[in-house]
Amino acid sequence: MQIGDKVPEVLGVDQEGREWRMSDFSGRKVILYFYPKDSTPGCTAEACSLRDHFGELQALGYDILGVSADSAESHQKFAAAQSLPFPLIADTDKRLIEAMGVWGEKNRYGRITVGLLRTTFLIDEQGCV
């Protein structure tokens, strides 16, 4: 995904079972962040930082969506435990993750693995990166 590219229309289903589309955010800016795993230290810190600045970001016109390959049930527990005020998309088939180019090789302490690459996109009012 490059600057200026359009984000796919269908984003996926969140922890409450709601299906999200880019058209739901027409005319709004979106922080679309991808994270590897619910309830892990780094992912929890990232989500809580966005939670802690949620009001400020909304005042600037941003909506927030988190995405990982975890299940909706896992997202529901994570969102409840951390009091997250934004949707978490359960991309279990990795359709959005792969379309956005955030699945690939990563080096973890000298060991090459394949997984979700922690990435954040700022999406403009027209649905472009």
Model-based region annotation:
Residues 1-129:
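Chalcogenol-based redox active-site neighborhoods
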